[in-house]
Regions:
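A cross-kingdom feature strongest in bacterial/archaeal respiratory oxidoreductases
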Residues: 1-55, 84-275
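Non-catalytic, well-ordered alpha-helical segments in soluble enzyme domains
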Residues: 59-86
Length: 275
């Protein structure tokens, strides 16, 4: 952000990104917003707010309407106008179509818009899918140099940090590791033995010029030569709930390797920590 004269952050939380920007626009929580959506099977639904926006925040569609210079900038009006201009609420199975207002009220009352269009899923090409996965695995192994380790990033139960200040989500154990209020460097037993570490040991993970430290957890099923790290912990701007929970793995990520990087270096740094 240092090379950009004006930076604006839009969101419903004051976090590290907003702290790095010159301006912060208050975004409304999803439970404060009007909107619409389509389920995987084609079912359409109108999203209704549970409460009025507490801090006069804007939803995404309201911000876009404002930036685009639209005359209508209220969430309710935007959603209603969208469906009024489309055929979504004007089509009924009966010969006599009721007016839009009746269809709109019915959609709000029922929660879904009927009749729902049927979406046909494209057939799955099993052979092509297997070939793609095999190619990706082979490429990953080819990228892995001697002595390097593949570092994988996982959003985890905190959804990458969006829920890190929610005590209920922190208390929810990870379904694989059973950890709560903490993250770890997940590693296979074979790879751990090769590096002379075990569960509870503190190690450093280096990618490029950035290094982070974390606690090892030997995890059955973890691929040899790889480590996995849950994101969303060790935040610098977290709020009192998330403070002190785990370590921050985000410094290791780059825009071209957001989820996996085969060029990692792992080293024991001494010391132990209870997970």
């Amino acid at each position: 952000t240092a090379r950009v004269p004006n930076t604006v952050h839009f969101g419903d939380q004051d976090d590290e990104s907003s702290a790095a920007c010159k301006w912060h626009l208050v975004g409304a929580h999803p439970l404060e917003c009007w909107g619409d959506g389509r389920a995987w099977n084609g079912t359409l639904s109108i999203q209704q707010p549970m409460i009025r926006a507490l801090w006069n925040g804007m939803s995404v569609i309201e911000l876009l309407a404002l930036v685009a210079g639209e005359e209508t900038t209220g969430g309710f009006e935007i959603v209603r106008r969208t469906w009024e201009e489309s055929t979504g609420l004007a089509m009924t199975p009966s010969d006599q179509e009721p007016p839009f207002d009746a269809n709109w009220r019915k959609a709000l009352h029922d929660g879904v818009i009927e009749p729902a269009p049927v979406l046909e899923s494209p057939p799955l090409d099993v052979a092509a899918t297997i070939a793609m996965l095999t190619s990706a695995s082979t490429q990953s192994e080819a990228d892995l140099k001697a002595g390097d380790i593949e570092v994988n990033f996982v959003p985890g139960t905190l959804l990458g940090g969006r829920m890190s200040n929610n005590g209920w989500m922190q208390e929810l154990p990870d379904p694989i590791t059973k950890l709560a209020w903490d993250n770890a460097v997940l590693i296979s037993e074979k790879t751990a033995n090769e590096h002379g570490v075990t569960t509870g040991d503190i190690v450093s993970i280096t990618l490029g010029k950035n290094t982070v430290k974390g606690t090892v957890l030997v995890q059955p099923g973890q691929a040899v030569g790889t480590v996995s790290i849950m994101l969303g912990y060790g935040r610098d701007w977290p709020g009192r709930v998330a403070s002190g929970a785990g370590f921050n793995a985000y410094p290791l990520r780059t825009s071209d390797r957001l989820w996996s990087n085969p060029a990692g270096k792992l080293a024991a740094v001494g010391g132990t920590e209870q997970l």
